[in-house]
Amino acid sequence: MITIALPSKGRMKEDASAVLERAGLKVASVGNDRSYRGRIEGRDDIEVAYLSASEIAREIGAGTVDFGVTGEDLVREGLTNADAQVEFCARLGFGHADVVVAVPEIWLDVDSMADLGDVASEFRARHGRRLAIATKYWRLTQQFFSRQHGIQLYRIVESLGATEGAPAAGQADIIVDITSTGSTLKANHLKILSDGIIVRSEACFVRARKPEHEGDAAIQEIASRIKAAV
């Protein structure tokens, strides 16, 4: 049995189902509207599991589902080596949002990651502590700051609430957060660095890289149908 995981609610659920229907894989409910299982009309070899977007990313990485629709940001944050663990079969054209580095607007001389690196280097001497970054994306933040930009002098503050409010509340100096329009960042007097986009995310159709998928005609057919539909 092939399992496709879809978002369990909201616009993402509707849009994901629409993509599958265009691909000739019409989703039908099993039981009542609150059921977390579905099926594909005319296909006894496929089942649908309804999960949250973050759960889908995790289950794809673990290989407990075969395909899933979820945000690229969640996959790359949730998995240690995303490209080795999953295949991004298709970008679906909805759920657009960027994971970005944002700093206070009053930091007039900080417009790039290089500028921020200079600030981080001087921060401890000036303030007696490391630059604090509030985020829910600790893996992406570490990769972007340390590996891509060579910035080491910072500490991550786990954000449990509205990340964009952390600098004003004194909980952090800057943030790494996801944004669709940037309006919430502007409302909190934050600006995105010119080269501070970590991931340009959108909903993706993702396949778990499982040995048993190699040469499986049904797996290849599903992936091909989705690619053709978008």
Swiss-Prot record:
Subunit structure: Heteromultimer composed of HisG and HisZ subunits.
GO annotation, cellular component aspect: cytoplasm
Matches recorded under PROSITE patterns: ATP_P_PHORIBOSYLTR
Swiss-Prot/TrEMBL GO biological process terms: L-histidine biosynthetic process
Its EC number(s): 2.4.2.17
Tagged with keyword Ion transport: no
Subcellular localization(s) per the UniProt record: Cytoplasm
InterPro entries according to UniProt: ATP_PRibTrfase_cat, ATP_PRibTrfase_CS, ATP_PRibTrfase_HisG, ATP_PRibTrfase_HisG_short
Reactions catalysed: 1-(5-phospho-beta-D-ribosyl)-ATP + diphosphate = 5-phospho-alpha-D-ribose 1-diphosphate + ATP
Main location as per UniProt: cytoplasm
Top-level class of the enzyme under EC nomenclature: transferase
Function: Catalyzes the condensation of ATP and 5-phosphoribose 1-diphosphate to form N'-(5'-phosphoribosyl)-ATP (PR-ATP). Has a crucial role in the pathway because the rate of histidine biosynthesis seems to be controlled primarily by regulation of HisG enzymatic activity.
Phylogenetic lineage: Bacteria, Pseudomonadati, Pseudomonadota, Alphaproteobacteria, Hyphomicrobiales
Transferase as UniProt keyword: yes
MF-aspect GO terms: ATP binding; ATP phosphoribosyltransferase activity
Pathway terms, separated by semicolons: Amino-acid biosynthesis; L-histidine biosynthesis; L-histidine from 5-phospho-alpha-D-ribose 1-diphosphate: step 1/9
Pfam families, per the entry: HisG (PF01634)
Family: Belongs to the ATP phosphoribosyltransferase family. Short subfamily.
Protein name: ATP phosphoribosyltransferase
HAMAP family: HisG_Short
Organism from which the protein derives: Agrobacterium fabrum (strain C58 / ATCC 33970) (Agrobacterium tumefaciens (strain C58))
Free-text domain note: Lacks the C-terminal regulatory region which is replaced by HisZ.
Keywords attached to this entry: Amino-acid biosynthesis, ATP-binding, Cytoplasm, Glycosyltransferase, Histidine biosynthesis, Nucleotide-binding, Transferase
Origin superkingdom: Bacteria
